[in-house]
Amino acid sequence: GNENPDAGTIVTGQTVAYGYYTQKGIKFDERKTVLETIKDIAEVIHYGKDKTYSADQLLAHFMFPYSMHRQPVSLLSGGEKRRLYLLTVLVSNPNFLILDEPTNDLDLLTLQKLEDFLHTYKGCLLVVSHDRFFLDETVDQLFVFEGDGKVKGFIGNYSQYHDYLEEKNKEMKRDIAAQKQEVRNERPTSERKEKRSYKEQKEYE
């Protein structure tokens, strides 16, 4: 709903709950504690099959030790605020999760924790990323932008798509080589015909 469609209409199902992690982030009420910031959204998050995290368990899982839970948000570093922002998205229990370039601002350990979480995530996940390693860990289908407004769907992760492109390129080279070989095989025949025609012409003369 942040952008109006160029054409047509968007109909969202009644049970669809979006979670959107943006590059811009959000502005926190920095007077609130870390735990209050999460509990204001939800106290329990569901994941996997019949599993739940409480707000404090989710914080601990994402490397906010219990000693930090009563700490005001104003004391957090920039990286910690990005991590807390991620948790505000996850704790909203979305069944359609959108992650916009998450590897740009999150540290390696946070990304590993996020990957672990997404492995058990049962909803629809849409990731915008240039990080092929993160894509390999989290997605099983790609939308590839080919330019000129063309988008191609591919079933598989990034490495599988890369292998597909390499094999397609090899097939193209084999086809070109085969076509060149056909041309070489045809050329001597035509040349012999031309020579015979010239000899026959001389004998005729």
What are these regions (language model features)?
Residues 1-205:
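ABC ATP-binding cassette signature C-motif
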